[in-house]
Amino acid sequence: EAGTIIDGLQTTYSDYKVIKVEFYIHFSSTSTGYAGFQFKAGGSWITSPGYHSQCEYGRHHSQSNLTQDTNSNSSITINEDSNDRCENITGTLAWHRGPNSEDAMLTWDAKGMAYSGANYDFLLFNGAGGEAGTRNNTIEGIRWKNSSNSNLWWKVIGMK
């Protein structure tokens, strides 16, 4: 695990309206891997595949082409065969809190680069989400979730 991005959204950081993070992911081998994030609510990190509980960017060998797969747990995945290697993903994610208690959301924008034989393919990802059954204003934290063959660098670039 690459660590906790932020914990204490309802306590230590409750006065902040926007928290923005920049990240870069590199997959170091051709085996299946992933990198993404999870939410904390009710005092626990949500690890089950609940709707919008996690977002993943990954490299998999399950299909023969590059696709974006948005499924019931809000994972965003790059599927690839042995000739399509998604090696680099970069982007930002941000936590936004509005004036009302229910006006909170996480957004992300990312770009991926995949090499397929002699060509480079570029993919765009974006989305917004929260945790099913949990009001977004009660989300307490956000942390990274990644496999051992993914290298993940990140930095908080703004808090307001």
Residue ranges of predicted features:
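Surface-exposed molecular-recognition determinants
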Residues: 1-160
